[in-house]
């Protein structure tokens, strides 16, 4: 659906070195899954 490309995501993530790498599960907390309510409209 071309919301953003894989390469654009990787480039943006590299701008934030702590993205997905900082803290442990106690600090980050549980994964938040809310079905597709937040992301579904992005692909339309």
Swiss-Prot record:
Gene3D superfamilies assigned to the protein according to its UniProt record, in alphabetical order: 1.10.530.10, Endochitinase, domain 2
Biological process annotations from GO: cell wall macromolecule catabolic process; chitin catabolic process; defense response; polysaccharide catabolic process
Keyword flag Hydrolase: yes
SUPFAM superfamilies for the chain: Lysozyme-like
GO molecular-function term, one example from the UniProt record: endochitinase activity
Domain of life: Eukaryota
Keywords from the named record: Carbohydrate metabolism, Chitin degradation, Glycosidase, Hydrolase, Hydroxylation, Plant defense, Polysaccharide degradation
EC number assigned by the record: 3.2.1.14
UniProt catalytic activity: Random endo-hydrolysis of N-acetyl-beta-D-glucosaminide (1->4)-beta-linkages in chitin and chitodextrins
InterPro entries: Glyco_hydro_19_cat (IPR000726), Lysozyme-like_dom_sf (IPR023346)
Cross-referenced Pfam families: Glyco_hydro_19
Annotated family: Belongs to the glycosyl hydrolase 19 family. Chitinase class I subfamily.
Task performed by this protein: Defense against chitin-containing fungal pathogens.
Protein name, UniProt field: Endochitinase 1
Record organism: Capsicum chinense
Taxonomic placement: Eukaryota, Viridiplantae, Streptophyta, Embryophyta, Tracheophyta
